[in-house]
């Protein structure tokens, strides 16, 4: 029942709207307008302090038949940069790309458009369906700020399982595991002295930092854990023993205990190096989001797999090395599976999206909304 031409036209329209993280207001207004044109009630949620945006989250509930568990759908309105002045084109090969030196914006306007098309299709064809709550978030790319802000208004959310439409890979891909993510920020303060005349009177912050890093387990720590140094910064004259070095690193793990062990290990290395050199250490650990892991035999996954198969699409489960709004929703106690929607080469000017994947994503949402074979959408 999906209108394929309308779906594509809406995608072309939406990606032309600038909505880099923090500047989603115009995109919020457009989606809100399109949903209200269907007679739907739309709630604005989240303040600028929590969402880090000049826009807001949008919540829209499409009431369905009683007695069937509701389904939550989620997609984010923001994009990464360069995402201003996007000119989408559909190639003869059926693949959508950006004409200019920008991203395409399929991440995540593919998911946004598919959700809006579901609302329109249910309006056009009022068949029995389960209650579906549409959640459009802001600030996902910059830190899942919009999704995290939902926690303050938890009562606005339906009680059910969720589908997040924000994974690379084809329709049929179900991300059921993703890591938690923590950032370690540190400043090492040494003591300046003349590098030629009084080198032993100084304490090199650079040398201290390098010794700490050399002692760290980095890269692929184990099958569930990774760690990386993003910044090791020190600027100064060559004739001065460097007194200040900045250190920023991350750790990710699908295991909560392993994530803590890795960040503890990294800070222990910093402490030991500073103790040895006599430098001072100031550090903080910021936990950006928690990981999640859904059992492969969960009834919700079996239901989703059945829907995909009924469409002639082969379902498969996967793990992700990055985070999404699914992390935030799972942390709130809402089981959320992140679905592949077809986007490839995301976060780059080579981003692509096959039109057939956009269409199949919208078709899947239609089937999920009207599917009443199980009650496994209940959490």
Pin down the residues of each PLM region:
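N-terminal capping segment at the start of a domain
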Residues: 1-25, 287, 344-348
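Zn-dependent metallopeptidase/amidohydrolase metal-coordination segment
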Residues: 7, 232, 243, 313-375
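A short beta-alpha structural unit
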Residues: 12-16, 228-235, 250-254, 280-301, ...
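A non-catalytic alpha/beta surface segment that caps or lines the substrate-entry region
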Residues: 20-67
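Active-site metal-coordination/substrate-binding segment of hydrolases
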Residues: 54, 61-63, 67-136, 153, ...
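Glycine/charged-rich beta-loop-alpha catalytic/anionic-binding loops adjacent to active sites
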Residues: 90-103, 187-193, 311, 343-347
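Acidic/histidine-rich catalytic neighborhood of metal-dependent amide-processing enzymes
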Residues: 100-179, 221, 226-231, 237-239, ...
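Acidic-enriched catalytic cores of C-N bond-cleaving enzymes acting on peptides and small amides
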Residues: 198-233, 240, 257-280
């Amino acid at each position: 029942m999906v209108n394929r031409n309308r779906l594509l036209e809406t995608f072309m329209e939406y990606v032309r709207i600038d909505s880099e993280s923090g500047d989603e207001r115009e995109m919020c207004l457009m989606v809100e307008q399109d949903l209200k044109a269907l007679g739907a009630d739309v709630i604005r949620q989240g303040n600028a302090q929590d969402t880090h945006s000049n826009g807001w989250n949008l919540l829209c509930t499409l009431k369905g038949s009683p007695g069937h568990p509701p389904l939550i759908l989620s997609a984010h309105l923001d994009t990464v940069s360069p995402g201003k002045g996007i000119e989408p084109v559909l190639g003869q090969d059926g693949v959508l790309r950006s004409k200019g030196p920008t991203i395409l914006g399929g991440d995540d306007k593919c998911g946004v458009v598919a959700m809006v098309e579901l609302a329109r299709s249910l309006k056009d064809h009022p068949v029995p369906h389960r209650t579906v709550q549409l959640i459009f978030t802001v600030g996902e790319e910059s830190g899942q700020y919009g999704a995290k802000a939902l926690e303050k208004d938890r009562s606005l959310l339906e009680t059910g399982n969720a589908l997040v439409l924000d994974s690379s890979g084809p329709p049929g891909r179900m991300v059921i595991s993703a890591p938690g993510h923590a950032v370690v920020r540190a400043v090492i303060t040494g003591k300046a002295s003349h590098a030629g005349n009084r080198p032993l009177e100084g304490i090199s912050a650079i040398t201290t930092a390098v010794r700490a890093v050399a002692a760290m387990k980095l890269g692929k720590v184990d099958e569930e854990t990774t760690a990386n140094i993003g910044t090791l910064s020190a600027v100064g004259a060559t004739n001065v023993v460097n007194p200040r070095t900045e250190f920023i690193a991350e750790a990710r793990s699908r295991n909560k205990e392993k994530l803590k062990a890795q960040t503890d290990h990294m800070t222990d290395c910093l402490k030991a190096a500073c103790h040895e050199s006599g430098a001072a250490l100031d550090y903080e650990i910021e936990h950006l989001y928690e990981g999640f892991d859904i059992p492969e035999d969960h009834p919700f996954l079996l239901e989703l797999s059945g829907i995909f198969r009924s469409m002639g699409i082969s379902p498969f489960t996967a793990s992700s090395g990055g985070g999404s709004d699914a992390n935030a929703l799972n942390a709130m106690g809402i089981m959320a599976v992140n679905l592949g929607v077809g986007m490839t080469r995301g976060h780059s000017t080579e981003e692509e999206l096959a039109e057939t994947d956009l269409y199949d994503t919208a078709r899947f949402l239609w089937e999920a909304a009207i599917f009443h074979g199980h009650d496994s959408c209940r959490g």
